[in-house]
Amino acid sequence: TITVKDMEIFSQVISMCERADTSIDLIASILPSEMPRNICRAFSDASTRGVKVRMIFPKKGIDLDLSRLKGYFEVRLTNTMPAAGIILVDEKEFCVGGLDVPDSMNTLLGMWMNQSELASLAKLIFNNIYENSEIYSS
């Protein structure tokens, strides 16, 4: 387990995308248009390599701009978002992170883990939200 903060979180997400072989599951509390470009590129590169990428975004009542994501993505929207974002790779490693105080401009805090038992629990959380969200179609 490693604690990451601020820009280290984004570096960790990029590294995880580069290591992905089969799947990336993402619960993002921010929209793709708000993500750093290098994060969008990491997801796009993974998709191009044949990695299955599933993403859940908050339903904010606006059109979702996916123009920075190139490739194939399964995208869903939900009104029920956890305060922290989660990225799960190959059901082996995951990172949970968010602002130390929700809805603030404070420090980003995160925790990366490569423990399969905890990754299985993260997968259950993801699947529960995914199955109860709506399919996004542009």
Residue ranges and their predicted role:
Residues 1, 6-10, 19, 23, ...:
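PLD/PLD-like phosphodiesterase catalytic module centered on the HKD motif
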